Amino acid sequence: MSLQDKLRAYARLMRIDRPIGTLLLLWPCLMALVLAAQGLPDIKVLLIFIVGVVIMRANGCIINDFADRKLDAHVERTSMRPLVSGEVSVKEALTLFTLLGLAAFCLVLWLNPLVVQLSVVGIILTVMYPFMKRVTNMPQMFLGIVWSWSIPMAYAAQLGEVPVEAWWLFMANWCWTVAYDTMYAIVDRDDDLKVGIKSTAILFGRFDRQIIGVFQLAALGCFVMAGLVADRGVIYGLGIISFIGFAVYQQRLIFGRERAPCFKAFLNNNWAGMVLFIALALDYMI
């Protein structure tokens, strides 16, 4: 394999070609930084968190593929991942995971001790998540914790503490993550049943759309509470209304439980998060 092909395989392993996960991680993190700073966050902190999100999302993909390498060959969507195809060896993947983990940890060393402590918990949660699919029917709920962990870290970086407001945003993102990752899990449900992978899509069964709707409503309520506690105004309120519109559209997409529309609904959450973040930022600026 040429160096160029190897680098492409590494990029695919880290999902550099599929930035949706990075974006879904980034929007709530940026919201946390803006809320904690009550406007423009410290530039150093902002850059550290943006780079950190990119690195940790890549690292999460690596450890996920390592854990699932023997199962991915039996799932249509994942059968050509680099660890399955042999383009990247297990040793190479674990080496890359270690190097990226060290890079992320070096970044947080520029911040206060509370952020460093929270980052250690975050790394442990990241490593644990892929194995949850073997022991619980609710791995998406664990993923919600992992993907929301940057929120208390962001508040800690800006304020040196994690106030109540942060936990409203944490719960909003947790509920939102469970909702959109269940949409994603519906895409793989038939394959997951064959190979024994557990998911909320399987757990919820024929009530999947309704329960996704409950989590969307809960996320909406917590986003509203986060805004109320932070004394946000009309523009943030418009962002909340847009979030409702996106949720309704996603419910229409997943109505038939077909793979392509469900995946489209999952991807649509990027726009929901982006618009809500922009509304929050503008609410402080105008």
From Swiss-Prot:
The record's principal subcellular location, in a coarse class, is membrane
**In which pathway is this protein known to take part?**
Cofactor biosynthesis; ubiquinone biosynthesis
Q: Which residues cross the membrane?
A: 20-40, 43-63, 96-116, 142-162, 167-187, 210-230, 235-255, 266-286
Gene Ontology terms for molecular function = 4-hydroxybenzoate polyprenyltransferase activity
Gene3D superfamilies from the xrefs?
UbiA prenyltransferase
EC number(s) from the headed UniProt entry: 2.5.1.39
Q: Which InterPro entries match?
A: HB_polyprenyltransferase-like, Prenyltransferase, UbiA_prenyltransferase, UbiA_prenylTrfase_CS, UbiA_sf
Transcription regulation recorded as keyword: no
Q: Which Pfam families does this UniProt record tie to the protein?
A: UbiA (PF01040)
The protein's topology relative to the membrane is: Multi-pass membrane protein
UniProt keyword annotations, A-Z: Cell inner membrane, Cell membrane, Magnesium, Membrane, Transferase, Transmembrane, Transmembrane helix, Ubiquinone biosynthesis
Which reaction does this enzyme catalyse, per its entry?
Answer: all-trans-octaprenyl diphosphate + 4-hydroxybenzoate = 4-hydroxy-3-(all-trans-octaprenyl)benzoate + diphosphate
The UniProt entry's GO biological process terms, in alphabetical order, are: ubiquinone biosynthetic process
Spell out the subcellular localization from the entry.
Answer: Cell inner membrane
Q: What class of enzyme is it?
A: transferase
Q: Does the keyword Cell inner membrane apply?
A: yes
Instruction: Extract the HAMAP family matched here.
Output: UbiA
Family, per entry? Belongs to the UbiA prenyltransferase family.
Q: What does this protein do?
A: Catalyzes the prenylation of para-hydroxybenzoate (PHB) with an all-trans polyprenyl group. Mediates the second step in the final reaction sequence of ubiquinone-8 (UQ-8) biosynthesis, which is the condensation of the polyisoprenoid side chain with PHB, generating the first membrane-bound Q intermediate 3-octaprenyl-4-hydroxybenzoate.
Can you say what this protein is called? 4-hydroxybenzoate octaprenyltransferase
The record lists the lineage as: Bacteria, Pseudomonadati, Pseudomonadota, Gammaproteobacteria, Alteromonadales
